[in-house]
From Swiss-Prot:
NCBIfam families: PRK04435.1 (NF003361). It comes from Alkaliphilus metalliredigens (strain QYMF). PROSITE patterns: ACT. HAMAP family: UPF0735. This is UPF0735 ACT domain-containing protein Amet_0565. The lineage of its organism: Bacteria, Bacillati, Bacillota, Clostridia, Peptostreptococcales. Belongs to the UPF0735 family. InterPro entries: ACT-like_dom_sf (IPR045865), ACT_dom (IPR002912), UPF0735_ACT_dom-cont (IPR008310). Transmembrane segments: none annotated. Residues 73-148 form the ACT domain.
Length: 149
């Protein structure tokens, strides 16, 4: 939970959101990508009213839009195998995120806990894509976003 801009912000999985909020994001994406020119076209394509779009458009953003130029702190659970942390760091480097801090606990029971703080200003992909790529590395058990500034 974060407090900014006169309100409290939450990170919520899209599965928990009402359809009207998801349609708002979809309409905004259509406009952003230039697939439609007007808001009227966008809301018609996604099947929502213009009044609902205007009501929510300033209050919902994909996580990657909120995180551009921010500091993200992640917690990773990795199997204690040679080279896994290196692969994770290589993936971060490929995304052009900047590692600000990294902390690793002593591995116990074959598991290593890692905390990584990233500066996202120069990232060439969004944070969700980076997490998906890191999750595909053999030995990465779990990744959570702990904080964002």
């Amino acid at each position: 939970m974060m407090e900014r801009d006169g309100g409290t912000h939450y990170i919520v999985n899209e599965k928990a959101l009402p359809i009207v909020l998801l349609k708002t994001v979809e309409a905004k994406e259509l406009l952003k990508k230039g697939e439609v020119v007007t808001i009227h076209e966008a809301v018609d394509r996604v099947g929502m009213s213009r009044s609902a779009y205007y009501k929510y458009k300033d209050y919902i953003f994909p996580l990657y839009e909120m995180n551009k130029g921010k500091i993200i702190t992640m917690h990773l659970i990795l199997k204690h195998l040679p080279g896994i942390l290196s692969e994770v760091l290589n993936q971060i480097a490929e995304s052009e995120a900047s590692v600000l801090t990294i902390n690793q606990s002593i591995p116990a029971h074959g598991i290593a806990n890692i905390s990584v703080a990233l500066e996202t200003r120069q990232m060439t992909i969004n944070i969700e894509e980076l997490i998906l790529k890191m999750e595909q590395i053999k030995g990465v058990q779990k990744i959570n976003i702990l904080a964002q500034e």
